[in-house]
């Protein structure tokens, strides 16, 4: 990717588009534009744009009313068309690792690799049961036709897609840069489409799990993200998140008895996180669950709640601007 001066971090899910334009000068990041726009039901389904015309109308309105000027865009995706898997490979020279990962990726990904764009993040080195050196990676695979669709639709609106990344990884990067220290922590990320559970220490990822929203709370989650929640929706969602957290932590503990999780961060774009934490801790109280504040050293002149809501977009843009 060529070096760029400003870029738009861009997220799409079933109910809205979010975008942040960021510039970098002398190592300092500045937010030039920030905004979101709701999407009508049916425009996005199963991670795909089903109605490109209505999508472009909403996108154009967001870009114009939000004062966006950059044309370079980094798209963040986190839906059922993105697969993340923790995998271990024999230790090889750095220049040979990518070929090995691509050749063996099918063993870990439940979708034909011919249909996927595959990338990976090195999660650290170790040894296997036979004391042989290994490299741990997190595989990230996204359906090629979904990526191509976003590139084509955004190009029709005169936007240039310079990269496509997993949004949850940009959120994790933001935590590492501004929130966490040396502790081992877990990220519990709730979107309208998925729940992610990722265990991290420093730059090393040691577990990743993604599940679709359970059918029994689909309606509650949709209403909550639309701002139309009913009286017991938050309680029901919190209960399920608590159960999923308990299951994930138990599985991790069985595999890593000597390295326990010390803290869990709940991530959403909602303003109901405190209530969700209460629901989670009613079910699972073994490890502290908190809601992080992102980029507190530089609030970019915006309210902290806004920074937290757009943390994924901010992280996507910052990562692109860091590329030399």
Question: What label would you give each PLM region?
Answer:
Residues 1-324:
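Hydrophobic/aromatic-enriched cytosolic interaction surfaces used to assemble or bind macromolecules
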């Amino acid at each position: 990717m060529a070096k760029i001066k400003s870029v738009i971090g861009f997220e799409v899910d079933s109910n809205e588009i979010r975008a942040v334009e960021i510039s970098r000068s002398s190592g300092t990041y500045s937010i030039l534009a920030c905004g979101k726009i709701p999407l009508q039901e049916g425009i996005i389904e199963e991670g795909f744009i089903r109605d490109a015309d209505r999508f472009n109308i909403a996108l154009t309105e967001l870009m114009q009313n939000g004062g966006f000027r950059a044309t370079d865009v980094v798209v963040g995706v986190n839906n059922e068309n993105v697969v993340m898997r923790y995998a271990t490979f024999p230790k090889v020279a750095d220049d040979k690792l990518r070929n090995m990962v691509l050749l063996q990726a099918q063993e870990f990904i439940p979708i034909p690799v011919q249909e996927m764009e595959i990338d990976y993040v090195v999660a650290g080195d170790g040894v296997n049961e036979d004391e042989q050196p290994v490299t741990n990676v997190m595989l990230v695979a996204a359906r090629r036709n979904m990526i191509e669709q976003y590139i084509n639709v955004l190009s029709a609106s005169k936007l240039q897609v310079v990269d496509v990344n997993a949004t949850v990884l940009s959120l994790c990067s933001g935590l590492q840069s501004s929130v966490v220290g040396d502790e081992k922590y877990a990220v519990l990320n709730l979107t309208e489409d998925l729940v992610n559970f990722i265990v991290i220490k420093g730059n090393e990822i040691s577990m990743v799990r993604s599940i679709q929203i359970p059918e029994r709370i689909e309606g509650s989650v949709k209403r909550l993200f639309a701002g139309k929640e009913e009286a017991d929706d938050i309680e029901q969602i919190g209960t399920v998140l608590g159960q999923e957290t308990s299951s994930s932590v138990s599985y991790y503990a069985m595999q890593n008895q000597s390295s326990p999780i010390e803290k869990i961060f709940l991530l959403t774009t909602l303003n109901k996180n405190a209530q969700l934490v209460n629901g989670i801790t009613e079910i699972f109280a073994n490890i502290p669950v908190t809601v992080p504040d992102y980029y507190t050293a530089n609030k970019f002149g915006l309210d902290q709640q806004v920074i937290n809501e757009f943390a994924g977009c901010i992280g996507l843009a910052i990562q692109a601007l860091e590329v030399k």
